[in-house]
Amino acid sequence: VIVVIGVLIAVLSGCTFEGGDRMTGTADAGRETTAERQAGTGQVEAGVLKGQVVDAAGRPVAGAKIVADNQLLYDSNLVVTTDEDGRYQMSSDVAAATFRVTGTVTRRFEGRAYTMELTPHDDTPFVGADGAIRDFTWRLTGERSDGLGFYGALVLFYLESYDPQNPDTFLQDEDVTLTLTPQGPLIDGSAGEVITRRAERGGDGPGLLDVPIGRYRITAEHLGRPLKIRIRDTGEYGEAVVAGFEPLTTTVYRIQLELKP
């Protein structure tokens, strides 16, 4: 035990502790030039974890949070943020430790902070002493690398199924089509596109899955017939609403609507 502790102290002397056993570092911006860091990114260095974060257009993402989860010691993760070139580097030469690396990016948009998970190019664990390169991409949509849902957000609705014009027939969620028109750039600064999709039912209810975070004007129809719409439990019904996303969990966001004939 004494030997292991001594090795840990020697290896991690350049890190600081943040809240208990969590250790933090900073992106290596002082020892080498940007060109030198770029030239070295493609080669694995023993005892070093490094990589780069870019967005879907290939632009560097500064300020992304990279976490190397120490699978040997509880609550002793290594944490670093990316520099202006989207690059990061930290020592991973921890005795007998294996790490799995994840990342998030937090951005303010329309007055709210959103934290979104990054897509790893390689999510296999690695031995800290061996070192590794772990790059990430910030994607607004697409299936998650772990298969647990999507990177995009949810647009959910509650449909009043009773139709006063046809009391003997109940409206079906799956027959609803939503149209989302972006009201400006998306959260990553890219231009959004008009989304027109038929509803599907997910674990959180009927609606649209995997929608890029932005602010949208939303309309709804049922088999071609326009529906009245409002933000759930808010305001009067109308022909359209303009809405942004609210948090469902730490990294999952949603818009909730109410629809009626």
Outline where the language-model segments fall.
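Sec-dependent bacterial lipoprotein signal peptides
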Residues: 1-13
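Long luminal/extracellular ectodomains of secretory-pathway precursor proteins
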Residues: 15-52, 59-261
